[in-house]
UniProtKB/Swiss-Prot annotation:
Species the sequence originates in: Aquifex aeolicus (strain VF5)
GO MF annotation list: ATP binding; proton-transporting ATP synthase activity, rotational mechanism
The name this protein goes by in its record: ATP synthase epsilon chain
NCBIfam families attached to this UniProt entry: ATP_synt_epsi
Source species, domain of life: Bacteria
Subunit relationships: F-type ATPases have 2 components, CF(1) - the catalytic core - and CF(0) - the membrane proton channel. CF(1) has five subunits: alpha(3), beta(3), gamma(1), delta(1), epsilon(1). CF(0) has three main subunits: a, b and c.
CDD domains in alphabetical order: F1-ATPase_delta
Gene name of the record: atpC
Keyword Cell membrane: yes
UniProt cross-references to Pfam families, sorted A to Z: ATP-synt_DE_N
HAMAP family: ATP_synth_epsil_bac (MF_00530)
Length: 132
């Protein structure tokens, strides 16, 4: 068993021991078991799920994944239990707004910021549609 903690600025979202955890990262999905090698990488929006059950889990946005042989710590900008995701209408609105802002971005920095927002909203919307 490996200890998993998922924390957002609002506080602890999940804490428990699991056989395995799958985490979306910028390098792809990472599967983690007890005694995993040390790892630190960046999260990308997606679903963190436990024990191979990809029907339930915690939706995360951007952040950091820190793995030690006994513990997985996920520090996410936003994290939601699958049943508590924002409404689809709100996510669609956020996505459309980000796409509009991308079209009018004045700098590469602005463009990257709005691309990130669009990816986050699109991914959360896909999770809402899949799990509701």
């Amino acid at each position: 068993m490996i200890q998993v903690e998922i924390v957002s600025p609002q506080g602890m979202v999940y804490s428990g021991e699991v056989e395995s955890v799958n985490v979306p990262t910028v390098e792809g999905e990472v599967g983690i078991l007890e005694n995993h090698m040390y790892l630190m990488t960046l999260l990308k929006p997606g679903l963190v799920y436990f024990n191979g059950d990809d029907k339930n889990g915690i939706a995360v946005t951007y952040g950091v994944l820190d793995v030690t042989p006994q513990k997985v710590l996920i520090l996410a900008e936003e994290a939601y239990e699958v049943g508590k995701l924002p409404p689809a209408s709100k996510l669609k609105e956020e996505f459309e707004e980000a796409v509009k802002k991308m079209a009018t971005a004045q700098t590469m920095e602005e463009l990257k910021e709005w691309e990130k927002e669009a990816e986050k909203a699109r991914t959360l919307l896909e999770l809402v549609e899949k799990y509701r």
